[in-house]
Amino acid sequence: MPKEYTSVSKISGPLVLVENIENVKYGEVVEVKLANGEIRQGQVLEAQEGAALVQMFASTQDLSLKGMRVKFLGHVLEINLSPEILGRTFDGLGRPRDGGPEIIPQKRMDINGSPINPYSRAYPQEFIQTGISAIDGMNTIVRGQKIPIFSGAGLPHATLAAQIARQARLLNEEEKFAVVFGAMGITFEEANFFIENFKNTGALERTVLFINLANDPVIERIATPRFALTAAEYLAFDLDMHVLVILSDMTNYAEALREVSASRKEVPGRRGYPGYLYTDLATLYERAGRIRGKKGSITLLPILTMPEDDRTHPIPDLTGYITEGQIFLSRELHRRGIYPPIDVLQSLSRLMRGGIGEGRTRKDHGDLSNQLYAAYSRGLEAKELAVVLGEAALTEEDVQFLEFAEAFEMEFIKQGEYENRSIFETLDLGWKLLRRLPRSSLKRIRPEYLDEFWGKEDAS
């Protein structure tokens, strides 16, 4: 039976120091009983011989050293799991916040998990359809990939996250698909937006939500993505489901990590973030993937807002080293009313080539994507030239590419919040736009694909 200690010697911010203790381990769950009988929970942040530093899951402003009793429970944070978690909404510590009953566990799992052994990984190859052309056509996501969305303050990343969670599916409808959504440090209005959005569209029945609000304890914010990923591991590797995990906003997570680090008086790293920020992010991101011999998979889509739109900021910078590409949201496109404002030239999916082509999407997908990139890039160059020298300085072909770039933004990138395009609709739309250009300028597409999809009757 766990011992109770009354040897609390110091309370500093969210931290409580307990001395004269024994057999306490890092990450252990703690119960703190106040003089009035109220019980609060915490977690061991640091354990040394005879002492432990405890991070509380609630405010410590009204705590007093007098009458406090501390009990170390002998286990780390765990989550109750069963198939019943689908369709449920939990707080950042895995407690129901939807008014439903507690989960009767078929399994309890340590939320810290462990990254997948590189030797056991299977290479991600199968296509995931999001219904968004700028992603499916140009920056394809495959099962088991980890690819972040780099956004900025005021950009519609929350709307985009909800749309992806709502529309994402496999082309093979027979396979089981689920979404785990972990929200960190969001406002009540944002939380209500996600919950109502999923309820009203029927997406909630295949979704698990973990929501940490901005006024919830900081330590809970650090635990939230771990609860979400542990739930995803259960669905993927125990129930053989293909799981898309969306974590928003990782910037709030990193800020919480910095706050806890400052409370512990650790030596700060870049811009005040702890020196272990890279390692900590890797322990989250590397839990995504596929495992040989397992049917399920975890695909990770972390969303982060870049402070001051600075892509060299430590959070996006370190994230880029771990993940397999990125999707950039453009403030310029957003100003012009284009949703989703995805900057396809700045975005990249490093695993795209393995997930497209015949048998996965369509045989012309790779060539079409290359040609759209090249034509859009040339159109933007023509646009810059027209700004400096005037449109009169452009050749006839330059004008065609300029018009193509404008049409590409308004018809291909831009789409409705509830518009769900199939991959075949996206590819056909790409061909439709390319018909604005002379066939002779489409040098990135094989002749046989031009004959089949561009159309000989459209040749010029």
From Swiss-Prot:
One Pfam family this sequence matches: ATP-synt_ab_N
Record's protein name: V-type ATP synthase beta chain
Keywords annotated in UniProt: ATP synthesis, Hydrogen ion transport, Ion transport, Transport
Lineage, broadest ranks: Bacteria, Pseudomonadati, Dictyoglomota, Dictyoglomia, Dictyoglomales
SUPFAM superfamilies linked: P-loop containing nucleoside triphosphate hydrolases (SSF52540)
RNA-binding listed as a keyword: no
Biological role: Produces ATP from ADP in the presence of a proton gradient across the membrane. The V-type beta chain is a regulatory subunit.
Domain of life: Bacteria
Entry's family note: Belongs to the ATPase alpha/beta chains family.
InterPro entries documented for this protein: ATP-synt_VA_C, ATPase_a/bsu_AS, ATPase_F1/V1/A1_a/bsu_N, ATPase_F1/V1/A1_a/bsu_nucl-bd, P-loop_NTPase, V-ATPase_su_B/beta
Record-linked PANTHER family: V-TYPE PROTON ATPASE SUBUNIT B
Entry's Gene Ontology BP terms: proton motive force-driven plasma membrane ATP synthesis
